[in-house]
Regions:
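N-terminal anchoring/stem segment of glycosyltransferases
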Residues: 1-58
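C-terminal catalytic/acceptor-binding lobe
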Residues: 3-11, 16-18, 25, 131-205
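Short loop/turn segments at strand-loop or loop-helix junctions that form parts
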Residues: 5-12, 39-41, 67-68, 96-99, ...
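Conserved catalytic core of nucleotide-sugar-dependent glycosyltransferases
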Residues: 55, 69-150
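Short aromatic/hydrophobic "clamp" motif used to bind/position activated sugar donors
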Residues: 62
């Protein structure tokens, strides 16, 4: 059972600061044993577009992540063990909350039920093509969580207390393009929203 990574490479205007942050994560991720490392650099991707691409890998573990996220070998090993031992793999989905990374001595769990930068599937799922959900926009994770939990009836967990991936965004709010000068959100993904509460790997049944 292979593990694949799907991510974008996007910023609304040319921004060398964001590009450097994305590059930092890319250099980390490319050293890992991903079977496929798929990067959409044509536009801001949607969950729909990634899930369509993931249909090429129906027997693999497929990770959708933002470009400022990176992983390590322990994450991949723990993830592989989880799916190997889970009976109904197609029903298991993970929506993970980030660990903010500045350096090896400064890593903090964001500990939020309403924020997931990473979603993981065995194979893929079908979303309504009439509703395109963009990555990296406020509420995109909560909207996707609602569809997965309420419409598709998947078993969705957030074991980010144990399963740690890292978010590298030291530039913070200064490069968030959905904020105005007062640091207020100027957009949000509409529709029903759900939160995914934090848990440990041992809580997944």
């Amino acid at each position: 059972m292979n593990i694949n990574l799907f991510t974008g490479w996007f910023y609304d205007t040319k921004n060398i600061i964001r590009e450097n942050e994305f590059n930092f994560c890319y250099e980390k991720n490319k050293k890992l044993n991903f079977n496929q490392y798929y990067i959409d650099n044509t536009k801001r991707p949607t969950y729909n577009s990634f899930l369509n691409e993931m249909k090429k890998y129906p027997n693999d573990i497929n990770i959708i992540a933002n470009p400022d996220n990176f992983f390590d070998d322990k994450f991949l090993n723990d993830l592989h063990n989880l799916y190997t031992n889970y009976k109904d793999k197609e029903k298991l989905c993970l929506g993970l909350t980030r660990w903010d990374y500045l350096n090896e001595n400064d890593i903090k769990h964001f500990r939020a039920k309403d924020s997931q930068d990473v979603f993981i599937f065995y194979g893929s799922v079908d979303l309504n093509t009439e509703e395109q959900i963009p990555l990296g926009r406020p509420g995109c994770d909560n909207r996707l969580a609602s569809i997965l939990m309420c419409d598709l009836k998947l078993n969705v967990f957030n074991p980010s207390m144990d399963l740690k991936y890292y978010h590298y965004h030291p530039s913070g709010d200064s490069t968030r393009t959905y904020l105005n000068e007062k640091l207020e959100r100027t957009e949000v993904v509409m529709g029903a929203h759900e939160f995914i509460h934090l848990c440990s790997l041992n809580d997944i049944k």
